[in-house]
Amino acid sequence: MRKRTAVIVGACLVGQVVLASTPASAGSPIRAREVVGDLDQPVAFTFGPGKKVWYVEKGTGQVRVHDLDTDSDRLFVTVPGVNGDGERGMLGIALHPRYPNKPYVYVYATRSAEGQLRNQILRYRDDHRSGVGRKVLFSSIAGGSPYHNGGRIAFGPDGMLYAIVGDAHDSGNAQDTTNEDRGKIIRIEPDGDVPPDNPFNDRVWVFGIRNSFGFAFDPQTDALWETENGPSCNDEINLIERGENYGWGPNETCDGSSPGNTNQDGPSPVLPELFYENTIGITGIAFCEGCRLGQSSDGAAFVGAVNNGEVTRIVFDDQRVGIAGHSVVYDHGGGTLSYEIGPGGRIFFSDFNGINKLVRV
């Protein structure tokens, strides 16, 4: 078991009293500027050519496109049968890495299919600005609870599609590696096939995942970093490596103040690079490479929180395999959700009502 020592005393669960983690400096020059407003829970978005934001609305089933240059908005497709209860709904979106030459749009949705609620990755073809030819690439039972569905999808530097599949509020799923996709990060080819170099001869890339909402690839190393939500303790930031176990499972507990007290299930569990003793509802993550937020931000990652809206800057060690420091640089007030890199390398994030850009003032 690897030992990691970076600790933050964070916030409590949604609906409870929120305690500050590391208060944002009053002199911090980082602020947020809304670029798209009046949206209905845009929990996931991505960018396409021509300063276009592709986003999903959690409960409506809609995939929409907003042109930042003209401030115009259009419907791409409405996914049928979407269930937006709890943490279900339209949860992820990605464009094919060669879009528009490969005109495919991918979404992760909780929807009625095959006679039950399922979490599915769907691929649509962009035909004259409308989504057609729906194809199911992945389908997993959503479970009886509306929580822990995952949903983040993104293409990696290797051209493969990665997706978070939550444990469906059943902690045993995370350690079940016998034909169980829940509680995992999966990796598939753009057409849904299983890559031959996956570690378990199936879609699973890593296991022991609980209730993650975010991951991103470090542009300097291609390494995958993930954010993870604990029960009532120990939200995490993890360095994800092929075939590893990230320790969440049926014995999760908060009897103690270290990650070893909460996520030690299964073989050789990997402990986090950083954790919060109390939860902040950690969400998206994005890397700054020329994001124009100051020299101290270049090479750092920015992570969000749904409980208190704090934006935290994460600084890495020289090898970029560990975390050297962290600080809250902006307090959004309300929760922040997905984080993405957009035009000009700028960092954007969504909240429950719109999409925002981090700026330096």
Segment roles from a protein language model:
Residues 34-61, 280-292:
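Beta-strand-rich domains and repeat architectures in extracellular enzymes and scaffolds
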Residues 1-26:
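Secretory targeting and sorting signals
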Residues 34-40, 77-85, 138-144, 203-208, ...:
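Surface loop/turn motifs at the tips and blade-to-blade linkers of beta-strand repeat domains
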Residues 72-96:
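Blade-loop segments of beta-propeller domains
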Residues 60-61, 88-90, 98-100, 167-326, ...:
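Beta-propeller domain segments
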Residues 54-78:
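Beta-propeller domains
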Residues 118-154:
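Asp-box/WD-like beta-propeller blade repeats and closely related beta-sheet repeat scaffolds
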